[in-house]
Amino acid sequence: MSSSFGKIFRVSTFGESHGGAVGVILDGCPPKLKVDINLIQNELDRRRPGQSDITTPRNEEDKIEILSGIKEGFTLGTPIAMLVRNKDQRPGDYDNLEQVFRPSHADGTYHLKYGIQASSGGGRASARETIGRVAAGAVAKQLLKTFCNTEILSWVKRIHDIESDINKEKISLKQIDSNIVRCPDEKVSTEMIERIKELKRQGDSCGGVIECLVRNVPSGLGMPVFDKLEADLAKALMSLPATKGFEIGSGFSGTYLKGSEHNDAFIKSDDISKLRTTSNNSGGIQGGISNGENIEMKIAFKPTATIGKEQKTVNAEGKEVLMKAKGRHDPCVLPRAVPMVDAMVALVLADHLLLNHAQCDLINK
Amino acid sequence: MSSSFGKIFRVSTFGESHGGAVGVILDGCPPKLKVDINLIQNELDRRRPGQSDITTPRNEEDKIEILSGIKEGFTLGTPIAMLVRNKDQRPGDYDNLEQVFRPSHADGTYHLKYGIQASSGGGRASARETIGRVAAGAVAKQLLKTFCNTEILSWVKRIHDIESDINKEKISLKQIDSNIVRCPDEKVSTEMIERIKELKRQGDSCGGVIECLVRNVPSGLGMPVFDKLEADLAKALMSLPATKGFEIGSGFSGTYLKGSEHNDAFIKSDDISKLRTTSNNSGGIQGGISNGENIEMKIAFKPTATIGKEQKTVNAEGKEVLMKAKGRHDPCVLPRAVPMVDAMVALVLADHLLLNHAQCDLINK
Amino acid sequence: MSSSFGKIFRVSTFGESHGGAVGVILDGCPPKLKVDINLIQNELDRRRPGQSDITTPRNEEDKIEILSGIKEGFTLGTPIAMLVRNKDQRPGDYDNLEQVFRPSHADGTYHLKYGIQASSGGGRASARETIGRVAAGAVAKQLLKTFCNTEILSWVKRIHDIESDINKEKISLKQIDSNIVRCPDEKVSTEMIERIKELKRQGDSCGGVIECLVRNVPSGLGMPVFDKLEADLAKALMSLPATKGFEIGSGFSGTYLKGSEHNDAFIKSDDISKLRTTSNNSGGIQGGISNGENIEMKIAFKPTATIGKEQKTVNAEGKEVLMKAKGRHDPCVLPRAVPMVDAMVALVLADHLLLNHAQCDLINK
Amino acid sequence: MSSSFGKIFRVSTFGESHGGAVGVILDGCPPKLKVDINLIQNELDRRRPGQSDITTPRNEEDKIEILSGIKEGFTLGTPIAMLVRNKDQRPGDYDNLEQVFRPSHADGTYHLKYGIQASSGGGRASARETIGRVAAGAVAKQLLKTFCNTEILSWVKRIHDIESDINKEKISLKQIDSNIVRCPDEKVSTEMIERIKELKRQGDSCGGVIECLVRNVPSGLGMPVFDKLEADLAKALMSLPATKGFEIGSGFSGTYLKGSEHNDAFIKSDDISKLRTTSNNSGGIQGGISNGENIEMKIAFKPTATIGKEQKTVNAEGKEVLMKAKGRHDPCVLPRAVPMVDAMVALVLADHLLLNHAQCDLINK
């Protein structure tokens, strides 16, 4: 149900933030795919807490354990189960929150829906849940790299009102990871880091925008009508905690253009399968199907709901209470959300790669 | 596959724009629901072509035929099949397009994916495909009205750069439908209509933003992790033709706020199930689950790709050609997209209503 | 929901027995597949009522109408919608049944579940619902024939206690269709026809066993654990009206053998992909995956529940009533069930062919 | 994909027989359900190897570890992840099998499909995979017991040719578990145990039939057309290792009856929701929907493929080899298959309970 994603390359995650473990089952992965476990661990390291001064101080090593589906570095075609134990749990930190609803957090809605909640912390609403996504996404990335040389790059575009101006042509993973905020603009990244630290000192938080670029996308991925590639990407990214908006290609700003300005002109080509366009307002997708251009997206992340400042709120009886979060939390989720965006995009593309292969490559090739 | 949507309240659409018919099967609808066929026809009338000077002149009555699942105005609990015949087909209009890829349209990607295309017109990429969605959505609306008194209202917020300022408290369907552009701001709507007519005269097109408001949403709809309510809404709306962006609640602009500014404070309440917040930056959803506040969304629609102006493009051999669309098309899709937005939102909410009932109302009640 | 079948080669059927029409949407079919409409009509003719003295006299031409997804004899890769109008409806025939539950029929359970029923006749429980299955199955058969030269043959093995002894090596469609009971044993078929006629005269009915043989099954179809090929075949066939039992390979009788007797020995082969076995107790499937041998199944069909004899039963108030069915019904469903079995088997195999291609043929080829 | 089962009460299993662990995620379980972990462990003990002289000597404690979704004995409504470590692994036992295909086992088909296999033992085809099913089924059993007082009882009906005659009215779990073969007929069970021991001594194996009875089934579970209750039960049970046949109610033997003999007459009743029938050839299901009578099924299990006797077979190069299994295996799977049957039936019924509640209890109650 709600903890599964994908049609035939399909992940199912589990785990509460302060329970025994979090993890994922990845089913439907092709057999005999070479998988480098270090690359999985590396993505988890990019998303792990405690990685820098501007993330939550919760200190988790987040060491991945592979329980099934991989043998001597190759996939078996059977479910790949991956597990990370929760270690640095401090349920006590949230004791004062147990029956208090943090404003704009999931505490209240979980209580209204289920009438019961995980002991403490965010339960399934915690960012720890994304460990399973990131681990499975790291396998998806390797699948895409192996078959299509596809490269997924996400970075912090804006923090609060500090915006970077990135040359997408040249951007690389190395640049993105060169600083702790994951904005590949050296100068601007320093300002961003300062802003986050300042807000943290104030017991406050901020949000921003992550941009994602996918290179070497095969044309033909995606489908008409409901399972359009941009629709599945939108769902995937809007399922990440704290997201409030999604844009593909020209997004909202494209709506200020006329059709004659917005249309992406095709460039003549001897090889129709390698058709390119002069501009990319479409963001690499037309009619729900990739056209071979880069996929380009932007995702809005709201400021972290859990803040140190005192706030008025209510408890599970509806009575007014004052609260001040003691739990460890990120003053800004974006630096750690970068690998989550990568992962969700990889999961969508891997699923659509297999789906397209299933339906359209039986006859053509 | 790609033409089905929903988990247990599930629609499957079919039909090409110039084929025999378009339609939908709606499966999983509760039995004994009173359904007014006139309300279904009314929604189709709101989306039908030829309804005004600013829509495509293709003249289709779009008369709904119910083939199954309803008896004397009540649902049977079995699949509801609904059909609309294509009548005013002029495949000849698109003869010059058959092997020509309209820029930023689905022609090229369909060809790359399938290697074969519907005779003419947009095939499944045509807005005619949405007839099935709108018909099924009209049933979903009645289900939501019957069980929760839920009301879904969408309207044109902006056309090109002409923006309206709407008082959401007072807005009504009557106001929205009081003018042909479906912007409930009388003065601004006149400007919008003028702009669309002007661009039409120029053989050009424009886009804009539709806003959607849902009142009386029961709390508890939606689920953690992947099937968050906002994620399913994002997918539903980004699956509509011509969409480029989606926002829930504060959207992209909310990312300029600090956490202390963005958080929606709860108001104390004796009845916890009727909890409200002082602001609604969350847009009615927290942690993927509705909190009982209004759901508020914005959707970006790009300018129509098919324009009358001459454009350079390529044909299926990759050779450069000049084209000038003769087919009938909308200079701006937004007025007709309003009922499509309503429909997709209704389908998502109806499905989540049943899903929540399945999992969470067995014990509670 | 319950009216859809298949994961990526997916059918959704609709229609009540005495409503406007019955039909099907087939989604996920590969594009550019050559489809002969006559072969679809031919399968419908094999299942249509009124085809002989031993079937229901309801006279329906069951002429197929293709609404979408096929252009000039080739699939577009988009949903194929197919429709058959109900013509020879006589709702009056069932007037005396409207609130009476036929013993062992779906009348009672539909009433208990939905609290409302189709006007008359069996609604979705009628054999007319299978029209959509047979039409879609005829497309699946052509897909399987085109890609793998796969041939599906079903026939009547036993009627009541009259059993045939068939040489499976030589059996052909022509033989099967050479008589109206569809038993390819000329002598025994005459006895079967006599038995059915005799029971019909008595206002009674009978059941029996259909056998199914699939030749040229590619190895590798099916999956471990839940979606084993035999499990999906069992579900497909047990979803046909009136089925009470399913066997693959040695079935129940194989349980009387010892392992050393039951095991199918492999025959050495230079080409491992063409591995064969000396016996076929496995029925062509091992561990849920096809091994390249013929798939062999048997399906038990109970005697028709609707009979002309007077029976004691109850009405919707639970009161005892006497009933004697006036509606037109089959004294034995098996002759018309043969094409239904073919269709369901074809749908399962086509779906698994695409699924296997998706997961396992990306790397191998 | 293939390792998931259920629509909204959904399990996903993972794990190879000789990997790190096997387990399951159960998603969609209602919140606030009281779950007794001992009852889960108890079901695992019923299926664990090494429990008696007539099962495999592999000695696994199979101690369940709950990783998420349960807090202080109550479900949270979030995914319940359960894990069992593999301890008594002896991959060496199967060394001589690594590239040898055991006749009638999954070795050959896994190799043909995936081109790669788990290190040794059966991988996903091993009975160890069913641990996840049994653990999740034990939760489903508690759900059914809590809401409907439903009781699922399975037992060994026949071993090889030794058949028991059971009085279904009186049968109890205590009787079933009173002997190691799980046949509640004391005298016959002794013969069965002797037969199994004798065949084990000969290095041979046997199969048989398990019968399943479900009491207190609410009417209205199941759906028309494809997701008929008996169809989902057939799939569930035919997905268990070694199954070759499935019967509901009268099964194959019912096909020897006339309609007038086979029909189950309704008994008049003041309360229509408690309608009963004089006989139960339907096996508790009519038209795909439960009628409130007991559900009755029979499942055929073939003799274990892995035997100690020397057999001729082939290796992965297609060359002929002689083999004699050294690995520990069951001479007869039925005693341990009893809790597997219980589990699969529970999973199907729990899913259909929620599905029926979702669609049909919104209006009625």
Curated annotation (Swiss-Prot), chains A, B, C, D:
It catalyses: 5-O-(1-carboxyvinyl)-3-phosphoshikimate = chorismate + phosphate. FMN binds at residues 124-126, 287, 302-306, 328. Its cofactor is FMNH2. One of its GO terms (molecular function) is FMN binding. It comes from the Bacteria. Reduced FMN (FMNH(2)). It is an enzyme of class 4 (lyase). One of its GO terms (biological process) is chorismate biosynthetic process. This reaction introduces a second double bond into the aromatic ring system. PANTHER family: CHORISMATE SYNTHASE. This is Chorismate synthase. It comes from Prochlorococcus marinus (strain AS9601). The lineage of its organism: Bacteria, Bacillati, Cyanobacteriota, Cyanophyceae, Synechococcales.
